[in-house]
Amino acid sequence: IGLCRTEHMFFGADRLPAMHEMITAETPEERKTAVDKILPMQQEDFEGVFTAMKGLPVTVRLLDPPLHEFLPSLVEQSLKVQEMELTSTDPVHTDKERRLLAQVKKLHEQNPMLGTRGVRLAMLYPEIPDMQARAIIRAALAVLEREGETVDLHIMIPLVFTPVELATQRKIVEDCLAEEFDRAGRRIDVEIGTMIEPVTYTHLRAHE
């Protein structure tokens, strides 16, 4: 697989509530609780991919799109909150939807494709690449244990603009892999890299 895009794994009906919980979390602890709910689901997905590939190369791209793609539209969520405020809806549930609306407004961007996505998203929410790295390597080790098949694994850090961004995210992934290898008592080779997409970074590298 030249590029296994992980964002589609988050759109399932059993995953979106956890994504909303993560997005509206007010503390790192709350955010980690939410992503921990997603981790076993991601691991199961990756185990399926790795099993099907039978040792062929798989490049997994960490979460790339902006968070607003996982949220309802501003109009949709505004109408939902208004309706709840006009009816006798449970106040706790109403407050939860208000918090979601606040995040929809906060994450709204004029050009989200060049905004808070890819590596920038990972810098703001390091719990996401941490969770994904653990899910990926746990899945690879599980397939090795169960099938005796070593995964030819490559992890891509998305939409990098600067060397510092790449180094920061690479360290997060490497630290997670080291912890998981120690926990499992075995290891596999993993290649970590990026696709240099932004024109600015490409221009800078070309003139180094």
Annotate the PLM regions.
Residues I1-R205:
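Conserved alpha/beta-domain cores
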Residues E208:
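A short, basic/aromatic helix-end/turn motif that makes direct DNA contacts
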